[in-house]
A protein has these predicted regions:
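Alpha-helical segment of the N-proximal tetratricopeptide repeat
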Residues: 4-35
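Register position in tetratricopeptide repeats
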Residues: 18-19, 52-53, 86
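Structural marker of alpha-solenoid helical repeat scaffolds
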Residues: 35, 69, 102-103
Length: 104
């Protein structure tokens, strides 16, 4: 089998994720991040995957990196703020919300 492009790996990762195949999605997202550590969608999806398997704390750096790479995606802000709230970091969540508002 030929090597996948980043876009193909991301698409397959999303499909695996939606199908409940967390290990396969993790493998694909990890491969993308090895090639492009700041890839915004792969970072965001790794964060979503981590939250989905109960590793909420693990999700934070992925969401933060996704936001730093592409702060224009509203879902990245929502995921990051939601995770901070789930961890009881309300002050941090409010600060990030204020930051999101200032970025439009």
């Amino acid at each position: 089998m030929a090597e996948l492009t980043i876009d193909q790996a991301l698409q397959q990762g999303v499909e695996a994720h939606k199908a409940g195949q967390a290990q396969e999605a993790d493998r694909l997202y990890t491969a993308i991040l090895k090639a492009q550590p700041k890839h915004p969608d792969a970072n965001h999806n790794m964060g979503v995957l981590a939250v989905g398997v109960g590793k909420v704390e693990t999700a934070l750096p992925f969401f933060k990196t996704a936001l730093e790479a592409n702060p224009k995606v509203a879902q990245f802000w929502l995921s990051y703020i939601d995770t901070l709230i789930k961890l009881g970091k309300l002050a941090d969540g409010k600060a990030v919300l204020d930051q999101a508002k200032s970025k439009g």
